[in-house]
From Swiss-Prot:
Function of the protein: Core component of nucleosome. Nucleosomes wrap and compact DNA into chromatin, limiting DNA accessibility to the cellular machineries which require DNA as a template. Histones thereby play a central role in transcription regulation, DNA repair, DNA replication and chromosomal stability. DNA accessibility is regulated via a complex set of post-translational modifications of histones, also called histone code, and nucleosome remodeling.
Name of the molecule in the record: Histone H2B.1, embryonic
Keyword annotations of the record: Chromosome, DNA-binding, Glycoprotein, Isopeptide bond, Nucleosome core, Nucleus, Ubl conjugation
Annotated organism of origin: Psammechinus miliaris
Oligomer status and interactors: The nucleosome is a histone octamer containing two molecules each of H2A, H2B, H3 and H4 assembled in one H3-H4 heterotetramer and two H2A-H2B heterodimers. The octamer wraps approximately 147 bp of DNA.
Residues bearing attached sugar chains per UniProt: S110
GO cellular component terms listed in the entry, alphabetical order: nucleosome; nucleus
Intracellular or extracellular location(s): Nucleus; Chromosome
């Protein structure tokens, strides 16, 4: 009979790992970046007594990533058209106006302007 834990049985799917030598370091998982905490903070500002499921959080995170990529791509094209090498707040604002419809664009631009003003005054 083979010693258990050392040799894989025939037809076994998992490979048997040899025991780690003393002092061996544990491998850390790569961190997954997410907008989850920020989405949660905004939710609590708007609806303090409402929660969010992990599935809904995944969908919201995907949505924020998608919008970010669209705005960044459009702003990048605008800088290329104007033969510039730096994306400024003006390009971001124009990209938002081009991507978002009507009233939503107006609100996004005003909130963005407010955030930039708050950031520059805090410096």
């Amino acid at each position: 009979m083979a010693p258990t834990g050392q040799v894989a049985k025939k037809g076994s799917k998992k490979a048997v790992k040899p025991p780690r030598a003393s002092g061996g370091k544990k491998r850390h998982r790569k961190r997954k970046e997410s907008y989850g905490i920020y989405i949660y903070k905004v939710l609590k500002q708007v609806h303090p007594d409402t929660g969010v499921s992990s599935r809904a959080m995944t969908i919201m995170n995907s949505f924020v990533n998608d919008i970010f990529e669209r705005i960044a791509g459009e702003a990048s094209r605008l800088t290329q058209y104007n033969k510039k090498s730096t994306i400024s707040s003006r390009e971001i604002q124009t990209a938002v106006r081009l991507l978002l419809p009507g009233e939503l664009a107006k609100h996004a631009v005003s909130e963005g302007t407010k955030a930039v003003t708050k950031y520059t005054t805090a410096k």
